[in-house]
Swiss-Prot record:
Protein known as: DNA repair protein RecO
Keywords: DNA damage, DNA recombination, DNA repair
Stored SUPFAM superfamilies: ArfGap/RecO-like zinc finger, Nucleic acid-binding proteins
One GO biological process term: double-strand break repair
GO cellular component: bacterial nucleoid
Gene that encodes the chain: recO
Gene3D superfamilies found in the cross-reference section: Nucleic acid-binding proteins, Recombination protein O, C-terminal domain
Domain of life: Bacteria
Entries under HAMAP family matching the protein: RecO
């Protein structure tokens, strides 16, 4: 019997009343378990196997799918559950984590990062910025290491910088002419990309970012992911549609 602290990142129906639950845990990394009877509303496993739930879990099995025996909810992130926009961002965070990681490869830092991102989304901090931070932090997990601390071409650490997918990182103004595919990003956007990649989440604090800056950030991150990650996530496509609707709603309310 194994015990762990984990976050439910995916759940699927299995048979008439069971679930297959995918969790990212502090102790074991990503694992899958069968939760028997969890689809029944009165089941003792119903609450603890809800998507995004953070809890303590006890299960049998060390290889393949285990069998969940019991669980205790630590945090269910109820605000996320009740808000369609928060849900969309949190779903993407969990799907990205799921697709980027292998079974049973523990990474306590990644567990803590995911928990902090979901907690901050739940507490009402900007979900788009938090998700962008998560996307940048996930690059090394995917085996991607853009050069963000110096010019990817000449190695200079000072000057004006832009971001380039073809050069795999930032490039300084001295090298702009050497890379015609650079993104022509505003300087503050490049600074934020560097911060998101390098600094720990708890050092970044609550960042207030203008809508147009967030759009530039998303363009850069999406372009890099499309070029290098090989991931095509349904939740990301849905999230981009949600962003369009949210922007339209905000525009109507401002008018």
């Amino acid at each position: 019997m194994e015990k762990c602290e984990g976050i439910v990142i995916r759940q699927t129906s299995y048979r008439e009343s069971d679930k297959i639950v995918r969790m990212y845990t502090r102790e074991f990394g990503k694992i899958g378990v069968v939760a028997r009877g969890a689809k029944k509303t009165k089941s003792r496993l119903a609450a603890v196997t809800q998507l995004f739930t953070n809890g303590y879990f006890t299960f049998f099995g060390s290889n393949g799918l285990g069998t969940l025996q019991q669980g205790e909810v630590i945090e269910n992130f109820s605000s996320i559950q009740q808000d369609i926009f928060m849900t969309a961002y949190a779903t993407y965070v969990c799907e990205l984590l799921d697709k980027a990681t292998e079974e049973r490869q523990p990474n306590p830092y990644l567990y803590e990062l995911t928990f902090q991102i979901l907690r901050d989304i739940n507490e009402g901090y900007d979900p788009q910025i938090l998700t962008q931070i998560f996307e940048m932090k996930m690059l090394p997990v995917l085996g991607l290491y853009p050069t963000m601390d110096k010019c990817a071409i000449c190695g200079e650490t000072t000057g004006h910088f832009d971001f380039s997918t073809s050069s795999n990182g930032i490039i300084c103004h001295r090298c702009f002419e050497k890379d015609r595919y650079r993104m022509h990003l505003p300087e503050n956007v490049v600074k934020l990309l560097r911060l998101f990649f390098i600094f720990q989440l708890d050092r970044l604090g609550n960042i207030d970012v203008k809508p147009e800056t967030k759009e530039w950030l998303q363009k850069a991150i999406d372009t890099y992911y499309d070029e290098y990650s090989g991931l095509y996530l349904k939740s990301r496509k849905f999230l981009r549609e949600m962003d369009k609707w949210e922007n339209m709603l905000k525009k109507d309310s401002d008018d």
